[in-house]
């Protein structure tokens, strides 16, 4: 079976709470680090999540 072109990444909260989302991204089409604004339940706000080490 061929290996897919998607890799598992972790999105780490920029609020410093240590909260992490796990998702996948296409390693061929998106070379830059992913940044998304998502909900962090530890601070009860939407904050910026940046791609960190898995």
From Swiss-Prot:
A GO MF label: structural constituent of ribosome
GO cellular component annotations of the record: cytosolic large ribosomal subunit
A single GO BP: translation
InterPro entries registered for this protein in UniProt: Ribosomal_bL33, Ribosomal_bL33_CS, Ribosomal_bL33_sf, Ribosomal_zn-bd
Residue ranges crossing the lipid bilayer per the database entry: none
Keywords, in A-Z order: Ribonucleoprotein, Ribosomal protein
Superkingdom of the organism of origin: Bacteria
Annotated family: Belongs to the bacterial ribosomal protein bL33 family.
Name used for this protein in its record: Large ribosomal subunit protein bL33B
Lineage per the UniProt record: Bacteria, Pseudomonadati, Myxococcota, Myxococcia, Myxococcales
Gene behind this protein: rpmG2
